[in-house]
Amino acid sequence: MNTADDLANPLERLGGSVERVTFHSEASGFCVLRVKVRGQRDLYTVIGSAASVKPGEYVECHGSWINDRAHGLQFKAPQLKVVQP
């Protein structure tokens, strides 16, 4: 069943290669990644949670775009997993 929030902010999919791990907390899993998406020139900032993530790995994310006042456009991914490309 869809709620009003689900309809206002449907989850999008973003997948790509991790170019840089800007921040990763081993305690909470929270991470800030710079991701290269195929066919796109610029790197995207992805924030989410992952047990372990390294540059060169491929991540698949489900979330939504946010515009953070301090950090700009980011893809906030409650669902982030490392997968085989």
Protein language model regions, located:
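Short boundary/loop segments of OB/S1/cold-shock single-stranded nucleic-acid-binding domains
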Residues: 1-13
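Long, highly charged, low-complexity intrinsically disordered interaction regions
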Residues: 22-85
